[in-house]
Amino acid sequence: VTTKLKDLPLNGMLLCAIATLLAGCQATGGSNDSMMPGGGQAGTTPRGTSAELAQRAQQTPTGDRLETARLRTELAFNYFQRGQMAVALEEIKAALAADPVYGTAFNVLGLINMDLGENAKADEAFRKALTILPNDSDALNNYGWFLCQTKRERESIDRFMQALKNPLYASPDKPYLNAGICSQRLGNEPAAEDFFRKAVSLDPLNASANLRLGDIYFRRNDFERARAHVDRVNKNYDPSAESLWLALRIERKAGDRVAESSFAAQLRRRYANSEEFLLLQQGKFE
């Protein structure tokens, strides 16, 4: 049995919890801002709770259509993060009613439709966002992740590379991480390793990129490098079932039974109901 790292982020770590995994709101210049990547996180968090944003939206002067659109979009994203998709869609409709060319609203609409499995609608929304914001790195990253999720990996990598052309992009590690994941899906391990290494060089604590590098080196029997990347995750974040399982398998393969037993005990204590603990009980280490 071959266990694979999950494409979306890890319990209590970073990323789209998942793809898990999502972001916030970041000004990009001009009249639009942009919201977060599908495969990672970027920007700041929305500027208040749902109740605060709703109150501010109601108090916004009727003529200030851009501010209304911005607040409604942030409110929609709050609901999206909480899994309240019907309410999120209503808020996005209100945002676009206020400003039909507010690119960030189309970006968030794409994320919502992607989560709902409405792929045609998601594709249309992302394309509209990029028609309005053709060089927006977050929108490019989000659309790239959508393309990867819908088995258009080569096209997705092109979008991630476009996202990286902006020298002011605040989260360049995220497109590199996503490009690595999509390269693995294409079976291109050397490219994936290179992308993950670039992600880690930009953000040494990027949990998903570190675990993926750890997994690559584990499968090559390069235990020292594998251990270094997994240890970085387990020492800086609350360990997940996935990170403990990888650490356990590294030590087992390296022949360190004491360390293996320690990780097994942690996995049992923390994640007794996890898929990883079931694999441990079944003795399926590869």
Regions found by a protein language model. Name each.
Residues 64, 98, 132-133, 166-168, ...:
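Structural marker of alpha-solenoid helical repeat scaffolds
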Residues 74, 108-111, 142, 176-178, ...:
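Canonical tetratricopeptide repeat
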